[in-house]
């Protein structure tokens, strides 16, 4: 088994990837397709990855379980979730069960899904989606704050896609420094506690558990780490 087979599952686990998504990704790999009973092999490996990755990324697994628990508590009271990122962007995490409407046409029956804010919250989607949505919102906040800083420094040309930051070659050193500084500023704050405080304020009647305790990582090391920015 080579690194490529485990890479995607490992990288997407912090985003709340599901067993089925890992399985589907493995089914597309040449190494799996070359095997007899490739689909069974893909599912076997997917289950092993789901079991093993949390044993290696222990703290990430704890945070994911905590987020899912909090999302489940709120969703079971038929409520969505809202929070403000460190960049000031308001995020709404609200998946509602659509209303199904069957329409008979001349030659077939069409099933139409109608979405509105009167439908009940979809608990499963709320729980499954919270990790990815929070992580993406924090990634976006980091990018927004980095761009604001660079703009203030006079940079006007950007090529940004999610976690890929691009500027002209002459500005790369400045980008290197600024994106590190903004990352440190964001994560020097108690991000999970701030997130929970917002939820507790919005849902005062609910008992939401405290986040996992933080470790002893010195976030300031990001400023001098040679491999943080590549």
Description of each model-found segment:
Residues 1-230:
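Conserved catalytic core of nucleotide polymerization and phosphodiester-bond processing enzymes
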């Amino acid at each position: 088994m080579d690194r490529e087979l485990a890479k995607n599952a490992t990288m997407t686990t912090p985003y709340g990837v599901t067993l089925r998504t890992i399985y589907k990704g493995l089914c597309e790999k040449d190494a799996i397709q070359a095997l007899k009973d490739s689909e069974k092999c893909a599912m076997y490996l997917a289950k092993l990855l789901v079991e093993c990755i949390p044993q290696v990324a222990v703290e990430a697994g704890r945070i994911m379980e905590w987020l899912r628990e909090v999302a489940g508590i709120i969703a079971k009271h038929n409520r969505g979730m809202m929070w403000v990122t460190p960049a000031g962007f308001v995020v709404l995490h609200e998946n509602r069960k659509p209303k199904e409407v069957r329409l008979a046409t001349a030659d077939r029956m069409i099933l139409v899904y109608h979405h509105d804010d009167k439908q009940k919250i979809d608990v499963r989607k709320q729980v499954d989606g919270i990790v990815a949505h929070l992580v993406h919102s924090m990634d976006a906040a980091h990018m927004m704050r980095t761009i604001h800083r660079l703009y203030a420094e006079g940079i006007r040309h950007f090529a940004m896609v999610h976690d890929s930051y691009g500027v002209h070659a002459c500005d790369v050193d400045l980008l290197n420094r600024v994106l590190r500084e903004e990352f440190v500023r964001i994560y020097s704050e108690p991000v999970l506690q701030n997130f929970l405080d917002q939820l507790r304020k919005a849902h005062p009647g609910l008992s939401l558990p405290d986040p996992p305790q933080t470790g002893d990582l010195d976030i300031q090391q990001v400023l001098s780490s040679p491999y943080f920015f590549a």
